[in-house]
Amino acid sequence: MFDTPEDIGLSLEREKIHRVRNLVYTHWHPDHTMGCRVLEQLNMDWLKPRARKVTNVWLPGWVRRDFHKHLGLESHFQHFEKLGIAKVREISEGEALHIDGITLRAFHMAQPGLTSFLLRHGRRRALLALDDTRDWRPGPELSEPDILVIEMGWFERDTKNRRIVSPGDPIRQGEASFEETLRLIGQIRPRLAFLTHIEGLWARSYNDYLKLEREYHDHHLRVAYDGLRVAF
């Protein structure tokens, strides 16, 4: 499992997942970490302490350092370790991590503390770049994956051509636009690109996004949704 947004418990229930052996974090931002207490719900049995389960929590070194600085995350996970329901482990950039037949490698991105992950299963490869891809320059080892999962990026205008991101808006300096995402997809050249981190701020319906898929069919786009399953 990658990251723990605040609604992660609902997602796991929907997919009927009741055991998570490995949890990987991409960065410290609250929308990716503030559901971490799900580990208590998954692993702790207060009436039968011996029945508790353990989840390995994998953190790239730079993410671990941010956990020490932000949101009390390091304290949270120290608490989970004391309860015996988590084991925090650090990984370095490019280090091969083998989990259930899948090899994962972490790569530092341009924005502070952000991580992309390359997954390999047999000859199949998936690249995850889930947030803050602005100024990211993926190396050649990340090119031509079978699957790319990447943030949608922001839109300057809504579907009626009304401006929703003003020229001086800070989002322009801190976040990648949809056009920047398209350029990244063109550089990476995946077989399929799944767009995620979709915000209601962009004032688009799912049907609007389906139109976007058709408009940019040459980029092999798919717009993600809750419950989407991808064979890998």
Residue ranges and their predicted role:
Residues 1-129, 135-138, 204-232:
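Binuclear metal-dependent hydrolase catalytic cores
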Residues 135-228:
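Cap/insert and terminal regions of metallo-dependent hydrolase folds
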